[in-house]
Amino acid sequence: VDLDLAFGRGENSELLARVIREVPVRVELSGGITSRSAIEAGLAMGPERVNIATQALDDIDAVCEAIDAFGERVAVCLDVRGDQLAARGGRGEGGNVWEALRVLNEAGVARLIVTDVTRDGQMNGSNRDLLARVADRTPACIIASGGVNSLADIEALRALGIEGAIVGKALY
């Protein structure tokens, strides 16, 4: 995640491109990716996938065009607070998550990264209710984020059919 780009404090593309080239694992690129040119620049670095920021959903038609153009090479981040999108690193307000999800489904989104921003970094467990509701409303693969805190939490997510989980603070 390029947090500098996500928060408008610069970017780290050269460093990220080097990391992607040199590490022997599959890498996803996230953080401040809100335009087609940013998607193309990100994909040119060689990651497996580029994750489109929630903020990009302000222009959901452009996101749908990116889904059509890049398919499985892009995922869409849904940063959520209640039933609302929480763009700009969870600081801003967006539209209704369920309406956005409906439009993304129609566009054929392959993968979603769903983050409950109220749990992000709190290590109090993932919001399995939210994730189950999203899973019930989309055929897309789902990556859970926000509050994931234990192997038991990950196992519970797996039982919901969630494809993967982002574990951050709990690793420390």
Predicted regions and their residues:
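Short, contiguous strand/loop micro-motifs
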Residues: 2-3, 25-26, 50, 87-88, ...
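Active-site beta-loop-alpha junctions enriched in small/polar residues
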Residues: 3-4, 32-34, 55, 79-83, ...
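Charged helix-capping and loop-helix junction motifs
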Residues: 10-17, 60, 90-99, 124-133
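Residue-level marker of alpha-helix boundaries and capping positions
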Residues: 7, 29-30, 53, 91, ...
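Catalytic cores of alpha/beta
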Residues: 14-16, 22-50, 62, 129-165
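Glycine-rich, proline-tolerant flexible connector loops at the mouths of alpha/beta enzymes
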Residues: 1-14, 54, 113-124
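Alpha-helix N-cap/loop-to-helix initiation residues
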Residues: 8-9, 35, 59, 120-123, ...
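Conserved anion-binding
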Residues: 40-43, 47-120
